[in-house]
Amino acid sequence: STAETESTAETEFAFVDASLQQQAGQAFSRGLKLLLQLQQRDEAGLSLWAAQYHHRTLQPAWARAYEMPALAVMESASLLDFLLSLPKPSVELLQSIHAAANWLARHAITDQHWHPQLRVLQAKAGAGPLWPRFAELNTNRPIFGDRDGELYYDVHQVSLERRQGYAWYTE
C-alpha cells in the first residue's frame, strides 16, 4: 500500500538530514517533470521516450552509428515499470503511463518470432507479442541501424555482426 511504501521510505532513509531529503525530493520532482517533457508524440498523442536526447535541444539524437533518433521501446518499457512503482502519481504521470501502455498495445508484433540463434525474424502462428528495439519517430515503424550509419526498415538488411551483437527485438 501507499502508506506502507511511505513508512518504509521514512524508516529506510531516517539517517538522511531533513534538508538533504527535501533537496532530493525537489530533484526527483524535477526529474519527473523532465520525463513528462521528453515523452514523444505521434498522431495519436503521447507515445514513448527516445533512447537519447541532445543535451541542449532535448530533441531525440544519434548515439552510436546504429542508434538513431527513435522511440526506444525496451527502455520505455523499463521506464514504465519505474513510473508504475510510484506511490502517488500525478494526473499528468497517469496520462503519460496510460499513453505509453496504449502505444505498446497498439504496436505489439504478433505471429512473428525472433530466432535467438539465427538472429532472424520468422513467421510463427501464435507467437508474440514482441516489439522492435527502435521505432521511427512519427511513423512508429520498426527501424534498424548498422555501423555504416544507415537506417533500415528490415532487420535482415543489417549486417550479421550487428544482428548478433544487438537486441533488435524484445518481448
Pin down the residues of each PLM region.
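Beta-propeller domains
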Residues: 20, 24-46
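CBM-like carbohydrate-recognition segments
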Residues: 41, 45, 55, 102-171
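Short, structured motif recognition centered on aromatic/hydrophobic residues
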Residues: 32-35, 77-83, 101-104
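A general structural-boundary detector
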Residues: 11, 15, 63-66, 84, ...
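Structural helix-adjacent loops and short alpha-helical linkers that scaffold large soluble proteins
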Residues: 4-29, 86-98
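Solvent-exposed loop and edge beta-strand segments that line ligand/cofactor-binding
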Residues: 1, 62-76, 86-89
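Intrinsic, low-complexity N-terminal interaction/targeting segments
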Residues: 45-70
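Alpha-solenoid helical repeat scaffolds
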Residues: 2, 38-41, 85-89, 107
